[in-house]
Swiss-Prot record:
Residues modified to Phosphoserine: S93
Record organism: Saccharomyces cerevisiae (strain ATCC 204508 / S288c) (Baker's yeast)
Molecular function GO labels: enzyme activator activity
Protein's UniProt name: tRNA (guanine-N(7)-)-methyltransferase non-catalytic subunit TRM82
Keyword tRNA processing tagged: yes
WD repeats: 1-47, 48-99, 100-147, 148-192, 193-237, 238-279, 308-354
Additional information: Present with 5910 molecules/cell in log phase SD medium.
Positions of the UniProt region annotated as Disordered: 55-92
GO terms of biological process kind: tRNA (guanine-N7)-methylation; tRNA methylation; tRNA modification
Function, in words: Required for the formation of N(7)-methylguanine at position 46 (m7G46) in tRNA, a modification required to maintain stability of tRNAs; its absence resulting in tRNA decay. In the complex, it is required to stabilize and induce conformational changes of the catalytic subunit.
InterPro entries the record matches: Trm82, WD40/YVTN_repeat-like_dom_sf, WD40_repeat_dom_sf, WD40_rpt
Top-level taxonomy: Eukaryota, Fungi, Dikarya, Ascomycota, Saccharomycotina
Amino acid sequence: MSVIHPLQNLLTSRDGSLVFAIIKNCILSFKYQSPNHWEFAGKWSDDFDKIQESRNTTAKEQQGQSSENENENKKLKSNKGDSIKRTAAKVPSPGLGAPPIYSYIRNLRLTSDESRLIACADSDKSLLVFDVDKTSKNVLKLRKRFCFSKRPNAISIAEDDTTVIIADKFGDVYSIDINSIPEEKFTQEPILGHVSMLTDVHLIKDSDGHQFIITSDRDEHIKISHYPQCFIVDKWLFGHKHFVSSICCGKDYLLLSAGGDDKIFAWDWKTGKNLSTFDYNSLIKPYLNDQHLAPPRFQNENNDIIEFAVSKIIKSKNLPFVAFFVEATKCIIILEMSEKQKGDLALKQIITFPYNVISLSAHNDEFQVTLDNKESSGVQKNFAKFIEYNLNENSFVVNNEKSNEFDSAIIQSVQGDSNLVTKKEEIYPLYNVSSLRKHGEHYS
């Protein structure tokens, strides 16, 4: 049975008139017009072919060695005195049993003037720079593609809208001027680094205008470095026992972090003080399922060891609320930040959904989630939910009309697209955060 591939992320423009959605290797654009009317505004697909690129690289290497091989062949003779010619190497290509190739699009960000969209592509480990033109039939136009030696994992855009900070899979951080011309071969040196995979990065500044880069990694670390003098480490924030998957920044130097621990950490990143921790263990237990059982090789005899992790934590822009979700669960947890005691967190609300949450984002004071709706019966729905704060009720509520109309817009936009309408077994892996957890084998 074929289904529309679930949405992997959403990003909304400042005024809410433009929404970008990631599905597999595509970015879909929609214009939002009140009341609850959506208009398809174009699609961009990453057509980069990994297999062909591998073949091209191999062909270049073979061509470069051809003259050398010819000289060596002259020296090789059989017993009869005939020259022996070497057989050219076969160009590699995936065969039976080879792991599938997933061309994820990640890390959607808009520049502050919203004239450009920045994203990352797994296909060639690149940073993508798009022009955004709301008057065009297709609002996105790819302008530049900066390729890296390792996969970009997280990005942050500087206030000048031209500098992008990139944190990669191998622990290095780079600074790229998106107005520059991309190099054919990546030669840039990192501006700072960790010894393990980076998971998040933020470029911020203090009240004196001094800039800092905050990075988190798989090794429980949060590092604060001066920018652009990144060789100067300002401080480390220690307290996590497991990996840090997500961080977000608020006013007055507030930093929130989460990951493989069963706690949310609140910090004053300027002083390095851990202000508080919020233990969500008992809150999330009713929402855990078989997907949270530890891998068999790390289980006990009763097969009841569970492992869970926060996939994303994000703050409301104007309201004192922060939301997060645990990977492979059907809820988001909203916390209220104390206005009297900086860093104090208290449960505000738990919102449940019919399917597991895949991503969480925020637009002003609205939270947005995408759902793993591949098991939706009948007409596929529940691709995303838009969650608004109701001042009269002092609570967050799902805007069902807006969400339902968005479902219809998604369905119409992908009709006849054999890439985005796919078999269930061909859906990209949607739960990757739990793989960051380290077990005994990582310490041996």
